């Protein structure tokens, strides 16, 4: 058995089409959605990802602006830039590209973003809404993973799902999202201090690998027929043609055991970007409704 592919490119294409129509409708009402991205330093991977986000904006019809700051930018200077964007009436959504230099407290910067402009869905208020089940802005990658599975008609309700990794951008919010009333799965949160990691993973119907460790998930960790979602994007050198070699958190031979598996390229990545664009549109629509009711 060779696993079927969880095709994030195909699923995201349909989402982008819907978002383009929503953007046109907003423009017809005099609203121009706009995403502001702040990039600190010159990390090649971060720069490449930011540029891909802005290409998505252009394709959908969302305006975008990129604020580039040097690597030696102080935490105070960065937060000051964020506050300027918070006060800008033409900016619908804000993202500060992660990771940030070690000298900057990532949490303080995220907390400085206006929750009503938090396009990444990582502000404590929006994460709190996720916990309580109140409708808010959901972190992009967790939302994208759920959409990807739903698009392939993979039932999650009542299933046991192992989430390997407990980062604040994927692992933790994904566990909350999957165990919430909207999905109703049983979630096993696995991390580096967990005992019997392989055994815990092997009982799961769905395994989501988001540890950021190359090929940490071995074929022996997967029960036959399980669904595997590989979130990992690990840089493993450069090819002879000069292209960056990317590897996931899941060993390639796992495809011979799983029923479905997401590819490293074209799996979760396009879904994350689609959910970011969806968040920007949602923030624009919310702001439009607020102003409409206030008038």
From Swiss-Prot:
Its EC number is 1.5.1.5, 3.5.4.9. InterPro entries: Aminoacid_DH-like_N_sf, NAD(P)-bd_dom_sf, THF_DH/CycHdrlase, THF_DH/CycHdrlase_cat_dom, THF_DH/CycHdrlase_CS, THF_DH/CycHdrlase_NAD-bd_dom. It catalyses: (6R)-5,10-methylene-5,6,7,8-tetrahydrofolate + NADP(+) = (6R)-5,10-methenyltetrahydrofolate + NADPH; (6R)-5,10-methenyltetrahydrofolate + H2O = (6R)-10-formyltetrahydrofolate + H(+). PROSITE patterns: THF_DHG_CYH_1. Signal peptide: none annotated. Catalyzes the oxidation of 5,10-methylenetetrahydrofolate to 5,10-methenyltetrahydrofolate and then the hydrolysis of 5,10-methenyltetrahydrofolate to 10-formyltetrahydrofolate. One of its GO terms (cellular component) is cytosol. The gene is folD. GO terms for molecular function: methenyltetrahydrofolate cyclohydrolase activity; methylenetetrahydrofolate dehydrogenase (NADP+) activity. Pathway: One-carbon metabolism; tetrahydrofolate interconversion. Homodimer. One of its GO terms (biological process) is purine nucleotide biosynthetic process. Belongs to the tetrahydrofolate dehydrogenase/cyclohydrolase family. This is Bifunctional protein FolD. Keywords: Amino-acid biosynthesis, Histidine biosynthesis, Hydrolase, Methionine biosynthesis, Multifunctional enzyme, NADP, One-carbon metabolism, Oxidoreductase, Purine biosynthesis. NADP(+) binds at residues 165-167, 192, 233. CDD domains: NAD_bind_m-THF_DH_Cyclohyd.
């Amino acid at each position: 058995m060779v696993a079927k592919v969880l095709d994030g490119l195909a699923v995201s294409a349909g989402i982008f089409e819907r978002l383009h129509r929503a953007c046109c409708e907003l423009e017809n009402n005099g609203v121009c959605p706009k995403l502001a991205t702040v990039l600190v330093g010159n990390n090649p991977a971060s720069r490449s990802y930011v540029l891909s986000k802005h290409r998505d904006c252009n394709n959908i019809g969302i305006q975008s602006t990129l604020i580039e700051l040097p690597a030696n930018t102080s935490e105070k200077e960065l937060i000051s830039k964020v506050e300027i964007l918070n006060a800008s009436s033409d900016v619908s959504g804000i993202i500060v590209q992660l990771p940030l230099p070690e000298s900057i407290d990532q949490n303080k910067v995220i907390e400085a973003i206006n929750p009503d402009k938090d396009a990444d869905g990582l502000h404590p208020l929006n994460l709190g809404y996720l916990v309580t089940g109140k409708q808010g802005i959901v972190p992009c990658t967790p939302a994208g993973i759920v959409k990807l599975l739903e698009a392939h008609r993979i039932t999650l309700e009542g299933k046991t799902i192992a989430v390997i990794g407990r980062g604040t951008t994927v692992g933790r919010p994904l566990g909350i999202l999957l165990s919430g009333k909207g999905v109703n799965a049983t979630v096993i949160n696995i991390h580096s201090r967990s005992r019997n990691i392989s055994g815990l993973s092997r009982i799961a119907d769905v395994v989501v690998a988001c540890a950021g460790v190359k090929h940490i998930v071995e074929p022996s960790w997967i029960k036959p027929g399980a669904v595997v979602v590989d979130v990992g994007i690990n840089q493993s050198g450069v090819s002879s043609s000069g292209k960056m070699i990317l590897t996931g958190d899941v060993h390639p031979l796992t495809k011979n055991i799983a029923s479905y598996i997401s590819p490293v390229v074209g799996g979760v990545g396009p879904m994350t970007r689609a959910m970011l664009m969806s968040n920007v549109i949602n923030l624009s629509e919310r702001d439009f409704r607020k102003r409409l009711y206030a008038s």
